[in-house]
Amino acid sequence: MDVVPCLKVPQRHAQMYRKYLESQGVLDRRYGAEKHSDGTVTLLVVASALPQLDLVALKEHVAHDSFCEIVDIQAQLSKKSKVKSVHMKLVEAARSFLLSKGKEWSEDLGRDIPGRWQCHGDLVLFTEGCFSNAVWKEIGSEFWTAVALTLGVKRIAQIKKISQDGYRTPIVTMLLGDSSHVTHIDNHIRYEFDVTKCMFSSGNITEKLRIASFDCSGETVVDLYAGIGYFTLPYLVHANAAHVHACEWNPDAVAALQRNLEINGVSNRCTVHQGDNRQLSLSDLADRVNLGLIPSSEEGWPVACRLLKRSTGGIMHIHQNVTAPFHHEPSELNSSVEGSSVEVSPLRIQKDMQVWTAWASETAKRICTLLLGITGSEWKTNIRHIEHVKTYAPHISHVVLDLECKPL
């Protein structure tokens, strides 16, 4: 392990510090953040940036009620760096296995080996588009045993495609092992589900961490697209919401959600509503509505407007895949826009942010119109924050709009 300079911050503010350092181009991404027993987290900083790092200004900009200091620690390579080395081990294992069976190796086969995958306990889930060459089927199950040994797991599965059944049910093939039930622990929350019946959105980890940092004490939250509890559970376990109404129409996801509420000890603070959320009979009770559906949650906007408290209003967290001009370069960092100001990262994501802000402004106007039509009174909307979750393609970004809605 290397001794490297890092920024020591409180764990509850670590995500905000990480995102800011990343946006300024001074986060050393070769190393992962480390949690410590004293409730702090260390974030690795590029050594050349240390002389220009103003800790007082940094604290005031990110979280004025926190603390930060520079310390030296022995740091391990980040998961991303480790995955690269594991990928090379996987390529070498596949090559050695094929050669041992008298098969020829080629660069095309090397490109057929995935560089990314999901881990759920002792099960690895590969996505579609890899191991597509016919040779992998020809060499049989012994090959998957070798892959499992290389990755340190016992079971292997692969998503072939996503069903168009309205539930986004994954079509998954078990390549090694019989049971498809898994346990996934994410930010101290335990999720149990069947990989052949339910999706797990591992790419949404930054949004789940952001929700976990909210203070929802005393609030009633409605999660319109709950799934197995991706966002419902962070609201309950970490954000301390008084009560969450979780809506989900996939029966398999509902079963997993109810199980996950039980095993995390929060079922007494959650009401599960199975079925189409557009038929939900609730109204005038929510301080916060989560609309976590992509590519668009637009069908849920009228429902969310009906759910907000008429007397005090509340906040909508509106997910959307926003398309930027195709020629524009992809954004590589999670980024944010707050109020009317645009924060520009070193990776030139300003044009993306302009597109997100334009979408958010139009959405805010439409929500105002919907609220007027549903409640019969005027409302004011305020763009509190735009969160960039991830980029799917060079021109498609998953963003979340935090929209404050207040009656006039």
From Swiss-Prot:
S-adenosyl-L-methionine-dependent transferase that acts as a component of the wybutosine biosynthesis pathway. Wybutosine is a hyper modified guanosine with a tricyclic base found at the 3'-position adjacent to the anticodon of eukaryotic phenylalanine tRNA. Belongs to the class I-like SAM-binding methyltransferase superfamily. TRM5/TYW2 family. It comes from Danio rerio. One of its GO terms (biological process) is wybutosine biosynthetic process. One of its GO terms (cellular component) is cytoplasm. Signal peptide: none annotated. S-adenosyl-L-methionine binds at S201, K208, E248, D276, N277. GO terms for molecular function: tRNA 4-demethylwyosine alpha-amino-alpha-carboxypropyltransferase activity; tRNA methyltransferase activity. Pathway: tRNA modification; wybutosine-tRNA(Phe) biosynthesis. It is an enzyme of class 2 (transferase). InterPro entries: MeTrfase_TRM5/TYW2, SAM-dependent_MTases_sf, TRM5-TYW2-like_MTfase, TRM5/TYW2-like_N, TYW2_N. Keywords: S-adenosyl-L-methionine, Transferase, tRNA processing. It comes from the Eukaryota. PANTHER family: TRNA METHYLTRANSFERASE, TRNA WYBUTOSINE-SYNTHESIZING PROTEIN 2 HOMOLOG. Its EC number is 2.5.1.114. This is tRNA wybutosine-synthesizing protein 2 homolog. It catalyses: 4-demethylwyosine(37) in tRNA(Phe) + S-adenosyl-L-methionine = 4-demethyl-7-[(3S)-3-amino-3-carboxypropyl]wyosine(37) in tRNA(Phe) + S-methyl-5'-thioadenosine + H(+).
